């Protein structure tokens, strides 16, 4: 046996114990002092480097900071003007629009007051501190919750980020930390912390983090009540440490500090079953409202009426913890969309679906028209699917597939007229065989 077989060696560089000053033993492995020193140098270099190859905020071109697109306090629209803008893009939901318009206007008045106080322009009488009021939107899927929040962000020209509450977990478990919500907002603001701190965050599917029962469980609910607890300080206002690369935080990485005190949080969720909780509190039986022969429209109307009588206690009964409910004082209920509203969504808004497809076909020099009974048939099918306005695009996309596939290669089709029969068949292939030349009356 070689004399070197009895010598211990570094598991990393292979040097023997005689070749180094110190050899540190671990469970089945060894590391020498030279490798330890090399590891320290590598770590020091990485920690000295900036978290990402991004220039300082002052040196980066930023259209918001340039003042070209940044909303000044004097330019903030009044509540009536905000609602008018919302009406251009969102059909119905007038009560929710009013609630949002007033809440957003008051939020930015609060920011203006803070700015005035910092500049020393306020009088002693103006030293009253205005508290933040976050918003909770409750309504069925496809009723316009996310669209309302997105439209608000466009009106006010502030950073806007959307987060999904179902991906969040309590710290220490597999999933996303709640701080990753702030990272999305920071990225939208081009890493401008000051700009991000006056932005809007919409947290969707917030009802999915409700605890499973009202009674405290001995098992840990890491994606339910645990997430609600983690969100408390962020909603109220705190200095949060955000990892610039995302993922989990660890002690050796540099974090960006963001003050959430002035960030407006809008939470949204379907809260399926909340109407039953309210009905139970009111002491009324559903049978008293809905007769066996009533259709889905009657049931939706009753559910919408119950949601308008919602109280914070009902949300606690549903599974939201009292501390969380207390930090979202503004509640707005959205009504289910009926057939009439779905027809309006198809044709009236500035970005209406019919207008979008008309523009797409116009690029191929084809005039697209929908007969009124075809629009009605699309709305009826979307209503049956019970996914609100989201169903409309799927139906129209399926309907227009054949035409949109062939039209770019066809020169003989100059006009397409969509009829109810085509909607029921889910195909417009016959237009390619017999290009439509019907009169255009009753078309959308």
From Swiss-Prot:
Amino-acid positions noted as binding ATP in the UniProt annotation, renumbered to this chain: 140-147
Region described as Disordered: 50-73
Protein biosynthesis recorded as keyword: no
Protein biosynthesis found in the keyword field: no
Signal sequence extent: none
Gene3D superfamilies in UniProt: 1.10.8.60, ClpX chaperone, C4-type zinc finger domain, P-loop containing nucleotide triphosphate hydrolases
InterPro entries: AAA+_ATPase, ATP-dep_Clp_protease_ClpX, ATPase_AAA_core, Clp_ATPase_C, Clp_protease_ATP-bd_su_ClpX, ClpX_bact, P-loop_NTPase, Znf_CppX_C4
Listed PROSITE patterns: CLPX_ZB
Residues binding Zn(2+), per UniProt: 10, 13, 32, 35
UniProtKB keywords: ATP-binding, Chaperone, Metal-binding, Nucleotide-binding, Zinc
Domain ClpX-type ZB per the UniProt entry, residue ranges: 1-51
GO biological process per UniProt: cell division; proteolysis involved in protein catabolic process
GO cellular component: HslUV protease complex
CDD domains, alphabetized: RecA-like_ClpX (cd19497)
GO molecular function, one term: ATP binding
Function statement: ATP-dependent specificity component of the Clp protease. It directs the protease to specific substrates. Can perform chaperone functions in the absence of ClpP.
Complex formation: Component of the ClpX-ClpP complex. Forms a hexameric ring that, in the presence of ATP, binds to fourteen ClpP subunits assembled into a disk-like structure with a central cavity, resembling the structure of eukaryotic proteasomes.
The family this protein is said to belong to: Belongs to the ClpX chaperone family.
Name the record gives this protein: ATP-dependent Clp protease ATP-binding subunit ClpX
Species the sequence originates in: Microcystis aeruginosa (strain NIES-843 / IAM M-2473)
UniProt gene name: clpX
């Amino acid at each position: 046996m070689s004399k070197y077989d009895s010598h211990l060696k570094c598991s990393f560089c292979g040097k023997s114990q005689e070749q180094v000053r110190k050899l540190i033993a671990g469970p089945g492995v060894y590391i020498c002092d030279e490798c330890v020193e090399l590891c320290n140098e590598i770590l020091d270099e990485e920690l000295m480097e900036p978290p990402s190859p991004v220039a300082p905020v002052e040196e980066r071109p930023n259209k918001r900071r340039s003042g070209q697109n940044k909303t000044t306090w004097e330019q903030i629209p009044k509540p009536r003007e905000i609602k008018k803008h919302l009406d251009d893009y969102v059909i119905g939901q007038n009560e929710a629009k009013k609630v949002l318009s007033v809440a957003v206007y008051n939020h930015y008045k609060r920011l203006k007051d803070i700015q005035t106080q910092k500049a020393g322009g306020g009088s002693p009488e103006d030293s009253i501190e205005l508290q933040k009021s976050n918003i909770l939107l409750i309504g069925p899927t496809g009723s316009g919750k996310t669209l309302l929040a997105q439209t608000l962000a466009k009106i006010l020209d502030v950073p806007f980020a959307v987060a999904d509450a179902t991906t969040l977990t309590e710290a220490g478990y597999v999933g996303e930390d709640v701080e990753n919500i702030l990272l999305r907002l920071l990225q939208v603001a081009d890493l401008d912390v000051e700009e991000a701190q006056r932005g809007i965050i919409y947290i969707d599917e917030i009802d999915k983090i409700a605890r499973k029962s009202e009674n405290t469980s001995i098992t840990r609910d890491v994606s339910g009540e645990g997430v609600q607890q983690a969100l408390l300080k962020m909603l109220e206002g705190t200095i949060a440490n955000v990892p610039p690369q995302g993922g989990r935080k660890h002690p050796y990485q540099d974090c960006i500090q963001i003050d959430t005190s002035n960030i407006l949080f809008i939470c949204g969720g379907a809260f399926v079953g909340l109407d039953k909780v309210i009905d139970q509190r009111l002491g009324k039986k559903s049978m008293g409202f809905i007769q066996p022969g009533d259709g889905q429209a009657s049931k939706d109307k009753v559910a919408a009426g119950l949601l308008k009588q919602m109280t914070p206690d009902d949300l606690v009964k549903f599974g939201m913890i009292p501390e969380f409910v207390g930090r979202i004082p503004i509640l707005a209920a959205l009504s289910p969309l009926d057939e009439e509203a779905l027809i309006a969504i198809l044709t009236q808004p500035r970005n209406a679906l019919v207008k979008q497809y008309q523009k797409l076909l116009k690029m191929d020099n084809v005039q697209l028209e929908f007969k009124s009974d075809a629009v009605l048939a699309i709305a009826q099918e979307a209503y049956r699917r019970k996914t609100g306005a989201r169903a409309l695009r799927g139906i129209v996309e399926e309907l227009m597939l054949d035409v949109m596939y062939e039209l770019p290669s066809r020169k003989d089709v100059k006009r397409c007229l969509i009829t109810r029969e085509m909607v029921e068949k889910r195909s417009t292939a016959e237009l390619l065989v017999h290009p439509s030349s019907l009169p255009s009356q009753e078309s959308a």
